[in-house]
Regions:
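FAD-binding subdomain of flavoenzyme oxidoreductases
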Residues: 44-174
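Glycine-rich N-terminal segment of FAD-binding domains in flavoprotein oxidoreductases
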Residues: 1-42, 57, 77-79
Length: 174
């Protein structure tokens, strides 16, 4: 990703990150000499940490793949959408998505312990690195969560998970 950003800068081209293409707002539409950068191949899940309850995910990891991965280990990733089979972790973070369980579990921001981001100048930033208590100053990771790719391209995230709920009940309010 960094090399593509540097190349695009050299040729005065814009870069539009593209994830699962589940957004309906048109934010990932490229125009005016723009390069579309697919993040599909950044789909690795690694460094499962049962003590800190975190796992490292590439931006292209499908939401449902992460849910299944932690569920196999008897844990739970609660950020959930109807588009779970195609939405990607990077896009979920870039939009600070909430999903169908947002009232109970919060938005994506609550589940991001660390970020790796490539800025528009090609600089790679490692933000927070999963520290649970970090009182060293500004936590710039929160600037990128919900910024929709305007400040940089999310390439990797340290995602939190939790224990499986004892039971679930669905309630329809109309």
């Amino acid at each position: 990703v960094q090399k593509i950003i540097l190349w695009a800068n050299k040729h005065s081209l814009k870069v539009v990150p593209s994830g699962g293409r589940t957004g309906l707002s048109g934010g990932a539409v490229a125009k005016d000499k723009a390069v579309v950068l697919s993040l599909d191949k950044l789909n690795q899940i690694e460094n499962f940490n049962e003590i800190d309850k975190t796992v490292d995910c590439g931006a292209g990891v499908i939401t449902e793949a992460l849910q299944d991965f932690v569920k196999e280990k008897s844990y739970y990733f609660p950020v959930d959408f109807a588009a779970r089979g195609s939405s990607q972790i990077g896009g979920n973070i870039a939009t600070n998505a909430g999903g169908i369980k947002v009232i109970r579990y919060g938005n994506m921001r609550e589940w991001v312990a660390g970020l790796e981001v490539v800025t528009g100048k090609g600089e790679v930033l490692n933000l927070n690195n999963g520290m649970i208590k970090n009182n060293t100053g500004y936590d710039f990771r929160h600037l990128f969560i919900g910024s929709e790719g305007t400040l940089g391209i999310i390439t990797k995230a340290k995602i939190k998970f939790t224990t499986l709920p004892k039971e679930e009940q669905v309630l329809l309010l109309a």
